[in-house]
Amino acid sequence: MIKSKKKFSFICFLFCLQISFSQNTEKKILLIDALNFIEKKHNVSFNYSNDVLENILVDKPKKNLRIELLLEKLFIETNLKFTLLKDGQIIISKKEESEKVTILDEIILNNILTKGISVKKGGKITIRPNEFKILPGLAEPDILQSIQSLPGVLNANKKLSDINIRGGTHDQNLFLWNNIKMYQTGHFFGLISPFNPYLIKEVNLLKNGTSSKYGDGVSSIIEMNNKKSNTKETKVGFGTDLISLDAFLITPMSKKTELQFSARRAYTDVLRTITYNNFFDRIFQDSDLNPNNAQNTSENEKFFFYDISATIYHKFSKKHQLQVNFLNINNNLKYSNTQNTNSFLVPNNLSQNTFAISTDYHFKQNNLKLDAQLFFSKYSQFSTVNNLINGNRNQILNQENLIQENGLKLHGKYQFLDRLDLSFGYQLNETGITNAEDVVSPSFQRFIKEVVLTHSLFYELAYQSVANKFAGKIGFRNNYFEKFDIFNFEPRVSLNYNFLNDFKLEFLGEMKSQVTSQIIDLPQDFLGVENKRWILSNNDNIPILKSKQVSLALRYKKKNFIVTAETYLKRIDGVTSRSQGFQNQFEFSNTNGNQKSSGLELLVHNKFKNVKTWITYNFNNNSIFLEGLNNNSYFPTNQDIRHSLSLNTSVEVNQFNFAIAGNWHTGKPFTSINTTNPLETNSTINFNTVNSNNLKNYFRVDFSMNYTFKFKGRIGLSIWNLLDTKNILNTYYNLDENNFIKTINTNSLGLTPNVSFRINF
């Protein structure tokens, strides 16, 4: 009997213990969620590296505890060090690292615009897509669309394949995916980002003062990186909107190996939604697919896109790690049309494809870090156009732009003094670009292939003073272009000074070069949809692009109120007239020169309880000199948008998020015709002075909302151009078959709704 009672008591004890344990487990939440709660409750911001926080569970913070007690409790639970600074910023570091000084990529402004966007020392703007709450006009996170909300980023044509940063053209930006250069940056030929936001942990925008380890990008760098999640459980996510379906998987394959995989495919070749129809009309309005085209009527158009990415991480030991990356991006358009009232259907197609793969090795021991990467990438754009001549299908034009790039990158970092780091490395790049045309009837073939091999050595010193009052980096990059037997020396500098507790002053400077650029041979190339083609410098009529830039920034932060002001001067030498996209008297000119840009960027951001408001203003003055044109005088570039203003507000209410934004800017330049004498004697259009007129001002309002379910699901609604404002993005003129002048306007995207649904496991 006594034994039975003891057994019963023991069972009760176990049962109570299980209940207690279950209750405690239910109270456990992810550390990153606990930090979000503390930030809202106590008006502080945390500075941390993503890999420090992954998959750590803690007790749910109590509402009535002081911030100091909360941090002490988190220290006990996580064994991480929490350092509270005077400005309300909290530095999180591993305990074993806290005994020595580490020169951090310090966050100086956190959660600007929306959660997940921060400004770091050196002017680097960092975006963590998987922390996004909401941005106006977006139903789902979009990496490159998000960048366009930032100061200094303008887009005259409102396409992701034509992003302008501080007056530069799109090809002057360096897009890196896991350190591999990307030559294709848009789905739907420039309306959707092709990079999955649910695997990319961090996106960095660098406009100036970049590290010497980066080559290319005379205008800016957009860097996208995957990172190991260290998860012990499989994570799966599915999502859809009115354009595509997508899924991702993060799973441990073993204790030392992790797989990250994502895939997305448009269903636009099967189902056409209002979003698809509006996107289609926007992109193809100047092509044969335009239903208003009097000479060509398109039928049977089928368009789709897909992207696939995968990363495998393997940890041999604490010192040695391996990473393998794979990416495939594809856009495909097929359609048939009738020409000149002939009922015969003529097939045409246009495709873009990117393939990239790399192997990365990482070594870390004490104060030394070493990274090595081997990579290969291939980009191709191919089109087939069939033309009817005299009612017969007897002319076919095939065009191709092909890039193959491979190379080696070695990078080391050594901390040889407490507050001094030395970075060093070597990069080898082989870039080959082919441009080919094949015409049937009359027979014509053109095949041009250029290859440039570049060797680069780089080194950099970084210093951080006591109490983080001063931080500075100075670096040098030496490029040797083997084909031209040319050396190019590129200094880089970044200086940061903190004063009066709330103010930060920053000076940045750099020199850069690049051998790739985009040109337009004929407006109707590649169906007139993506008519730019990549080329290589030949050090003759296509010079190596070289840039110089300096900037000065002042930043102020007091609790949740932020003001930043930054001014810059930039010059790029080696620009060509064929890269500018002229549609006037300079359309077929072939000369080169330089471009000058100067400007001011302002950001005002405030958070009050659950409401965020921010204003961005940009002033830009962009002019270009091209030898032999415009009386050898500077004139405004096609990207010369002098003033732009954006007002944004977001509100968080329980599981709901709302965001609305108004975007305004002055009209871009265009070249008008001489109304007194519109035609020259040789039946060509008589233009006025180049880019001496401006389009009407641009205005657009965007709206978004989403709701997060407790079962890790989310539904979202976005409306792009809520007021359906009619904006003209470009105006140019052509002659028809009767030598009458036609005015052609390119219109912006009208009111476009989108709905998304996502669920994660």
Ranges and model annotations:
Residues L35, E39-H42, L85-I134, H170:
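Short, acidic, small-residue-rich periplasmic hinge/interaction motif at the N-terminus
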Residues F75, V119-G168, N179-S193, E202-T210:
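Periplasmic N-terminal accessory/gating domains of Gram-negative outer-membrane beta-barrel systems
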Residues L150, P194-K235:
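A beta-strand signature from Gram-negative outer-membrane beta-barrel systems
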Residues I243-Y267, Q285-N332, S351-L370, Y414-F424, ...:
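Transmembrane beta-barrel wall of Gram-negative outer-membrane proteins
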Residues T268, I274, V611, W664-T681, ...:
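C-terminal beta-signal and adjacent terminal beta-strands/loops
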Residues N348-D360, N401, E450, D502-K504, ...:
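Outer-membrane beta-barrel signature, preferentially recognizing the C-terminal barrel domain
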Residues Q415-S423, Q427-T431, S441, Q445-R571, ...:
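Structural signature of Gram-negative outer-membrane beta-barrels, strongest in the C-terminal barrel
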Residues T567-R571, N590-N674:
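Gram-negative outer-membrane beta-barrel transporters
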